[in-house]
A protein has these predicted regions:
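Surface-exposed loop/turn motifs in large extracellular/passenger domains
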Residues: 1-277
Length: 277
């Protein structure tokens, strides 16, 4: 139980000294990505619950710039929060990090003075999250995910909940699965709910900083090499529901709700087993 950034493994994981991604000597080429390898969370037979406000998940509340390999969340019973609620990750990638809602800020001010254009590729690598061989397994009766937040009058804010990642930008997921999912719920006004990823979008520098000089630099020189690092990708990823499973929200889907960007490729499973749900 906590407020923001709540996870069964860690509340927030990111590149070391995120504000130091820009260095007067090394540019953005110098960064230290986080690594999580062979970590397992096992609940009791009747499961465990996680509650919080925003960025609440069975594994990590928030991740940016690193790799996660061979991780499992077992006997999960329920996850509940106001927004960005996920079975494994609440927010993955840059997402809303530059927002004024208490999120992390990647400091790219002065980019036009410090950044060498050939280091744009490194920036893409610095914010990318790679996930492999990771599973979220609910209790026998199934686990529930609920984003309780709702829009105030005149608000356009989105609320997301999902069995794996609530909001994904610049995330590459491979050989990862959700099992024994019972229900996923979000508000019927601006709510996004799904079995695997609620909102999938391309992470970009516009999400990281809003300085006009940065945008003009990007527009003039392009991000051709870095773009590949910013597009989400889901390879051999599946979700399975218990009998009577459900997804309820303004925008809802068995695998994804709002799939703005990304690719899904389950072809390695064979023609009889390549369905994601």
């Amino acid at each position: 139980t906590g407020n923001d950034y709540v996870g069964g493994i860690a509340g927030s994981m990111g590149t070391a000294s995120v504000a130091g991604l820009l260095n007067t000597t090394l540019g953005v080429a110098s960064y230290l990505a986080f690594t999580v390898d062979n970590v397992h969370v096992n609940g009791a037979e009747n499961g465990f619950t996680i509650t919080g406000n925003e960025r609440v998940a069975g594994g990590f509340g928030d991740t940016i710039g690193g790799s996660i390999t061979t991780v499992s969340i077992n006997n999960l019973a329920s996850i509940e929060g106001n927004n960005l609620v996920g079975g494994f990750i609440g927010l993955s990638g840059p997402g809303d990090l530059a927002g004024a809602d208490g999120g992390l800020t990647v400091n790219l001010l002065g980019l036009n003075y410090l950044l060498k254009l050939n280091n744009l590729l490194s920036l893409g690598q610095a914010i990318e999250v790679k996930i492999k061989d990771t599973n979220v397994n609910g209790i026998n009766d199934g686990f529930t995910v609920h984003a309780k937040g709702s829009r105030d009058s005149n608000s356009v804010r989105d609320y997301s909940a999902s069995g794996f990642i609530a909001k994904s930008g610049s995330t590459k997921v491979e050989d990862s699965h959700v099992t024994n999912l019972k229900s996923v719920k979000a508000t019927d006004d601006g709510g996004y709910a799904s079995g695997f990823v609620a909102i999938s979008k391309t992470g970009g520098l516009a999400d990281v900083a809003d300085d006009s000089s940065i945008k003009s630099l990007i527009e003039a020189n392009g991000l051709v090499n870095a773009v590949g690092y910013l597009i989400p990708k889901y390879t051999n990823c599946t979700v399975s529901f218990v009998n009577g499973g459900s997804v309820t929200a303004d925008v809802a889907g068995g695998f994804a709700a709002d799939f703005q960007s990304g690719t899904v490729d389950n072809s390695s499973r064979g023609t009889n087993d390549y369905y994601a749900v």
